[in-house]
Protein backbone atom coordinates (compact mmCIF):
# COMPACT_ATOMS: atom_id res chain seq x y z
CA UNK A 1 0.00 0.00 0.00
CA UNK A 2 1.21 3.52 -0.79
CA UNK A 3 2.19 5.86 2.01
CA UNK A 4 1.24 9.30 3.29
CA UNK A 5 3.75 10.81 5.69
CA UNK A 6 2.93 13.06 8.62
CA UNK A 7 4.65 16.39 9.23
CA UNK A 8 7.09 15.23 11.88
CA UNK A 9 7.96 12.16 9.79
CA UNK A 10 8.86 14.37 6.83
CA UNK A 11 11.06 16.59 8.98
CA UNK A 12 12.78 13.60 10.60
CA UNK A 13 13.30 11.96 7.19
CA UNK A 14 14.86 15.08 5.68
CA UNK A 15 17.09 15.53 8.74
CA UNK A 16 17.98 11.80 8.95
CA UNK A 17 16.89 12.10 12.57
CA UNK A 18 17.46 9.03 14.78
CA UNK A 19 13.97 9.43 16.28
CA UNK A 20 12.40 8.05 13.09
CA UNK A 21 11.81 4.31 13.51
CA UNK A 22 13.66 1.84 11.32
CA UNK A 23 10.30 0.42 10.22
CA UNK A 24 9.25 3.85 8.95
CA UNK A 25 12.62 4.46 7.28
CA UNK A 26 12.44 1.11 5.50
CA UNK A 27 8.87 1.71 4.34
CA UNK A 28 9.68 5.16 2.96
CA UNK A 29 12.89 3.98 1.26
CA UNK A 30 11.28 0.81 -0.11
CA UNK A 31 11.00 2.11 -3.68
CA UNK A 32 8.04 -0.18 -4.40
CA UNK A 33 5.50 2.17 -2.88
CA UNK A 34 4.56 5.71 -3.77
CA UNK A 35 5.21 8.10 -0.89
CA UNK A 36 2.90 11.09 -0.74
CA UNK A 37 3.39 14.47 0.91
CA UNK A 38 0.13 16.28 1.48
CA UNK A 39 -0.21 19.99 0.88
CA UNK A 40 -1.47 20.14 4.47
CA UNK A 41 1.98 19.04 5.71
CA UNK A 42 3.70 21.90 3.89
CA UNK A 43 1.00 24.26 5.11
CA UNK A 44 1.60 23.18 8.73
CA UNK A 45 5.38 23.52 8.38
CA UNK A 46 5.14 27.01 6.90
CA UNK A 47 2.65 28.19 9.55
CA UNK A 48 4.87 26.90 12.36
CA UNK A 49 7.88 28.53 10.71
CA UNK A 50 6.06 31.87 10.45
CA UNK A 51 5.04 31.67 14.13
CA UNK A 52 8.64 31.00 15.16
CA UNK A 53 7.84 27.46 16.37
CA UNK A 54 9.95 25.73 13.74
CA UNK A 55 13.17 26.52 11.93
CA UNK A 56 13.58 25.23 8.41
CA UNK A 57 16.53 25.81 6.10
CA UNK A 58 16.34 28.49 3.43
CA UNK A 59 16.61 25.79 0.78
CA UNK A 60 13.73 23.73 2.24
CA UNK A 61 11.74 23.76 -1.00
CA UNK A 62 14.77 22.63 -3.02
CA UNK A 63 15.57 19.86 -0.52
CA UNK A 64 11.95 18.70 -0.59
CA UNK A 65 11.84 18.78 -4.39
CA UNK A 66 14.92 16.54 -4.50
CA UNK A 67 13.03 13.76 -2.71
CA UNK A 68 11.14 11.07 -4.64
CA UNK A 69 7.81 12.06 -3.07
CA UNK A 70 4.49 12.58 -4.80
CA UNK A 71 2.38 15.64 -4.04
CA UNK A 72 -1.11 15.13 -2.67
CA UNK A 73 -3.34 18.16 -3.08
CA UNK A 74 -6.31 18.86 -0.83
CA UNK A 75 -9.56 18.19 -2.68
CA UNK A 76 -13.21 18.94 -2.00
CA UNK A 77 -13.69 15.21 -1.36
CA UNK A 78 -10.98 15.33 1.31
CA UNK A 79 -12.65 18.35 2.93
CA UNK A 80 -16.02 16.56 3.07
CA UNK A 81 -14.32 13.48 4.53
CA UNK A 82 -12.90 15.59 7.38
CA UNK A 83 -16.46 16.59 8.25
CA UNK A 84 -17.48 12.94 8.43
CA UNK A 85 -14.74 11.98 10.93
CA UNK A 86 -15.52 11.45 14.61
CA UNK A 87 -13.82 13.96 16.89
CA UNK A 88 -11.16 11.68 18.35
CA UNK A 89 -8.58 14.34 17.56
CA UNK A 90 -9.00 18.10 17.12
CA UNK A 91 -5.83 19.05 15.23
CA UNK A 92 -7.07 20.18 11.79
CA UNK A 93 -3.86 19.14 10.03
CA UNK A 94 -4.00 15.62 11.44
CA UNK A 95 -7.70 15.34 10.68
CA UNK A 96 -7.01 16.22 7.04
CA UNK A 97 -4.26 13.58 6.90
CA UNK A 98 -6.69 10.99 8.28
CA UNK A 99 -9.31 11.99 5.71
CA UNK A 100 -6.78 11.79 2.88
CA UNK A 101 -5.57 8.41 4.13
CA UNK A 102 -9.14 7.10 4.01
CA UNK A 103 -10.19 8.65 0.70
CA UNK A 104 -6.98 7.75 -1.15
CA UNK A 105 -6.58 4.29 0.48
CA UNK A 106 -3.12 5.04 1.84
CA UNK A 107 -1.13 4.01 4.90
CA UNK A 108 -0.25 6.90 7.21
CA UNK A 109 3.28 7.03 8.61
CA UNK A 110 3.03 8.85 11.95
CA UNK A 111 4.19 8.85 15.56
CA UNK A 112 0.77 10.07 16.75
CA UNK A 113 -0.85 6.95 18.19
CA UNK A 114 -4.09 8.85 18.86
CA UNK A 115 -4.78 8.57 15.14
CA UNK A 116 -5.21 4.79 15.51
CA UNK A 117 -8.70 5.54 16.86
CA UNK A 118 -9.71 6.30 13.28
CA UNK A 119 -9.04 2.69 12.28
CA UNK A 120 -6.77 3.62 9.38
CA UNK A 121 -3.63 1.74 8.33
CA UNK A 122 -0.65 3.19 10.20
CA UNK A 123 3.08 2.57 10.24
CA UNK A 124 4.44 3.82 13.55
CA UNK A 125 7.25 6.29 13.11
Regions from the language model: what does each represent?
Residues 9, 41-42, 78, 97, ...:
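Alpha-helix capping/helix-boundary segments
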Residues 93:
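Acidic donor-binding loop at a coil-to-helix junction in glycosyltransferase catalytic cores
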Residues 61-88:
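Acidic catalytic patch
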Residues 1-37, 50-62, 104, 113-117:
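Short, well-structured N-terminal submotif of metal-dependent ribonuclease cores
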Residues 98-125:
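Acidic, PIN/NYN-like endoribonuclease modules and their adjacent C-terminal/linker elements
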Residues 7-8, 45, 75, 82, ...:
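Generic structural signal for small/hydrophobic residues in well-ordered secondary structure
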Amino acid sequence: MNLLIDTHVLLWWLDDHPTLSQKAKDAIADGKKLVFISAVVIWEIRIKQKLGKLEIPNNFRKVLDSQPFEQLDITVEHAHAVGDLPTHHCDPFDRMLVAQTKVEHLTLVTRDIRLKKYKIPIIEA
